[in-house]
A protein has these predicted regions:
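Conserved N-terminal phosphate-binding loop of PLP-dependent enzymes in the Aspartate aminotransferase
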Residues: 2-446
Length: 446
C-alpha cells in the first residue's frame, strides 16, 4: 500500500492566470506573455490557456518543434501514448542499460537521418552538450594523431571558429559563441582563434570576404602549429542572423583542415532534421564533415561522426567512457523522437519543407519588393528570414505581430526576423503569416 502524500483536492488545479506569478516568485520568467495550452493547441496553432487566444506559430519553440502541437499520429494513437507513458515512468541510464525502445529509436534515426559516411552515434541531453562532445571527439583525435606522429600529445587544445556564431552557453562552447555579450560576458573563456564569417549579404564582395577569412585561418594554423583540432561552424548561422555561406567557402575550409590535420565539424542543432529541405544542411553544400552535432527537432541531442575520426583506431567511439553521460539522452524523448521520425519519413516532410520553403521565399521576395524596409529575403527550405532597417523597428514589428496579429515570430541577429515553423506547416499557414507581416510593415514604419 502506497504511503505517498497526495495533494488535497484542488491543490493541483493551478489556474492558468497564476502561472507567470508562480514562476516569477522563483525564477526569471520573461518569455512570451501566454500560457501554452498543452491540450487545445494543434499544429501551428498555439493556444493561450488563459483566454483561448490562438497564435500562428512561426517560432516553433526555437526551431525545436518538428510536427507542431499534438500531431494526430502521436496524440490520437492510444498504443503510442501507452508506450510513451511506460517510458516516462522510469528513467533508465541509457549509457549502460539498454531497452527495446532505445534500440528502435537508434535504428529509426539511422534510417531516416543517418549518413553512411558518419556511422558513429552518441546521444546526450541538450544541443550545447552535443557540440561539447563533438569538440571532445576532436581534442582526443588530435592528441592521438600528434602522439602517433611523434609530436607532443599535449598539443591539440584550440578550436577554429567564426564570428557571429552561436554554439551554446556552457563549458567549451562559451569560447565559441559570440552573438550577444549578455550570453557570454564575465564567464571565463579560452582564447581560441576566430575568423570573420564571410556570409552572403547585400553590398559585400563575398569572394573577397572569403579570401580574407581563409587568410585568417591560414594564419591561425601557422601561429598554432598542430594545436588546432578542428574548424566548427553552423552551415547557416541561426541566432547570428540567418547568415548563409557559399559552398565554395566550406570546401576550401575542408581543404585547410586536411592540410593541417584538423577535423571539420558542423553544428546542425538548428539546421538539421529537415528544416532546410534536406535531412542536414551540409547535404546542400557538397561537403561532408567528420562530425555533426544535432538537436532541437531531433528531441534527443547528440553527434554523428565518421570520416577522418576513424583514422585513429582508439578514438572516443572505441574506448569505453571517453565520452558518456548517465542518461545518454532520455528514453522518453527517444520514444517520442522515433515516432516523429516515422511521421517525417511516412509523410515525406523533408521534401515538403523544400517545396513549401520555395513558396515562402518567393513570398518574401514579393514582400521585399513591396516594402523598402525589407531587405535580404533569404532561406533554404523553411529556414527563411528577412532584414529590417534597425533593431528597434524589428522589435516593434515582432511585438505588433504578436499583440495585434497573433503571430509568433523570433528575432535573428541585430535586425532580422526568422521563420522557424514546424515541418507540417502548410502553404496556407505560411501565406497567413506573410500576410500578417505585410499588414504590420504597412502600419509600423522605421
Amino acid at each position: 500500500m502506497s504511503t505517498a502524500v497526495r495533494p488535497a483536492a484542488g491543490d493541483s488545479d493551478l489556474p492558468a492566470g497564476r502561472v507567470h506569478d508562480v514562476l516569477r516568485a522563483h525564477m526569471l520568467a520573461d518569455g512570451f506573455d501566454l500560457v501554452l495550452d498543452l491540450e487545445a493547441s494543434r499544429g501551428v496553432s498555439v493556444v493561450d490557456q488563459r483566454d483561448g487566444t490562438a497564435y500562428l506559430d512561426m517560432f516553433g519553440f526555437f526551431a525545436s518543434s518538428a510536427l507542431g502541437m499534438n500531431h494526430p499520429a502521436l496524440a490520437d494513437d492510444g498504443a503510442f501514448r501507452h508506450e510513451l507513458a511506460t517510458a516516462a515512468i522510469n528513467k533508465p541510464s541509457n549509457s549502460d542499460v539498454y531497452t527495446v525502445p532505445m534500440a528502435r529509436f537508434v535504428d529509426t534515426f539511422a534510417r531516416v537521418l543517418g549518413d553512411p559516411a558518419l556511422p558513429h552515434l552518441f546521444f546526450v541531453d541538450g544541443g550545447t552538450l552535443a557540440v561539447e562532445n563533438a569538440l571532445k571527439v576532436a581534442f582526443d583525435w588530435k592528441s592521438r594523431r600528434n602522439e602517433a606522429a611523434g609530436r607532443d600529445p599535449a598539443r591539440g587544445t584550440r578550436v577554429l571558429h567564426l564570428t557571429e556564431a552561436f554554439h551554446g552557453r556552457s563549458g567549451y562552447t562559451l569560447s565559441l559563441t559570440n552573438t550577444d555579450p549578455t550570453k557570454i560576458a564575465r564567464f571565463p573563456k579560452f582564447d581560441w582563434p576566430r575568423i570573420d564569417a564571410p556570409y552572403l549579404t547585400d553590398g559585400r564582395d563575398v569572394e573577397q570576404a572569403e579570401e580574407r577569412a581563409l587568410a585568417q585561418a591560414r594564419r591561425a594554423f601557422a601561429d598554432h602549429p598542430q594545436d588546432i583540432v578542428c574548424f566548427v561552424a553552423e552551415p547557416i548561422q541561426g541566432e547570428g542572423g540567418d547568415h548563409h555561406f557559399r559552398p565554395e567557402f566550406f570546401a576550401r575550409m575542408r581543404e585547410l583542415c586536411l592540410e593541417h590535420d584538423a577535423l571539420l565539424i558542423f553544428d546542425e542543432v538548428q539546421t538539421g532534421c529537415g528544416l532546410t529541405g534536406t535531412a542536414w544542411a551540409y547535404q546542400q553544400l557538397g561537403v561532408t564533415p567528420d562530425v555533426v552535432a544535432f538537436g532541437k527537432k531531433t528531441q534527443v541531442c547528440g553527434i554523428m561522426a565518421g570520416g577522418r575520426v576513424d583514422e585513429v583506431h582508439d578514438n572516443v567511439f572505441e574506448v569505453s567512457s571517453r565520452i558518456n553521460s548517465t542518461w545518454g539522452g532520455n528514453l522518453t524523448d527517444m520514444v517520442r523522437a522515433r515516432r516523429i521520425l516515422e511521421v517525417i519519413e511516412e509523410d515525406r516532410l523533408i521534401d515538403r519543407a523544400r517545396l513549401c520553403g520555395t513558396h515562402l521565399l518567393r513570398r518574401l521576395d514579393d514582400l521585399a519588393a513591396a516594402h523598402d524596409a525589407v531587405t535580404e529575403p533569404r532561406g533554404r527550405g523553411l529556414m527563411c528570414a528577412i532584414t529590417l532597417p534597425t533593431a528597434a523597428h524589428r522589435d516593434r514589428v515582432v511585438t505588433r505581430l504578436r499583440e495585434r496579429e497573433h503571430v509568433l515570430f523570433l528575432a535573428t541577429g541585430e535586425r532580422g526576423i526568422r521563420f522557424r515553423p514546424p515541418l507540417t506547416v502548410t502553404i496556407a499557414e505560411l501565406d497567413a503569416a506573410v500576410d500578417a507581416l505585410d499588414r504590420t510593415l504597412a502600419a509600423v514604419h522605421p
